[in-house]
Amino acid sequence: MALRTRLGELLRPLNAEYGKVAPGWGTTPIMAVVMGAFLVFLLIILQIYNSSLIIENVDVDWTNGIV
């Protein structure tokens, strides 16, 4: 028999929802927005790395690193 703990009792409702699917699109639009925001973040980082996006007082000279 499994040991019953307070943490297990708190997490039991989450496990009861396992396998159930929300009707319709569910949270798909929210995930699409989050993925779009992450894409924009990655593009900004890439532009800073390529010096395509110039920001004042941000040095992107990678040759002066620690030797």
Curated annotation (Swiss-Prot):
Kindly give the Gene3D superfamilies that the UniProt entry links to this protein. Photosystem II reaction center protein H
Question: Could you tell me the keywords of this UniProt record?
Answer: Chloroplast, Membrane, Photosynthesis, Photosystem II, Plastid, Thylakoid, Transmembrane, Transmembrane helix
Q: Which GO cellular component term is one of those annotated?
A: chloroplast thylakoid membrane
What InterPro entries does UniProt report for this protein, alphabetically? PSII_PsbH, PSII_PsbH_sf
Superkingdom of this protein's organism: Eukaryota
Question: SUPFAM superfamilies in the record, alphabetically?
Answer: Photosystem II 10 kDa phosphoprotein PsbH (SSF161025)
Topology of this chain in the membrane? Single-pass membrane protein
Q: How does it assemble?
A: PSII is composed of 1 copy each of membrane proteins PsbA, PsbB, PsbC, PsbD, PsbE, PsbF, PsbH, PsbI, PsbJ, PsbK, PsbL, PsbM, PsbT, PsbX, PsbY, PsbZ, Psb30/Ycf12, at least 3 peripheral proteins of the oxygen-evolving complex and a large number of cofactors. It forms dimeric complexes.
Family the UniProt entry places it in: Belongs to the PsbH family.
| Protein name (Swiss-Prot/TrEMBL) | Photosystem II reaction center protein H
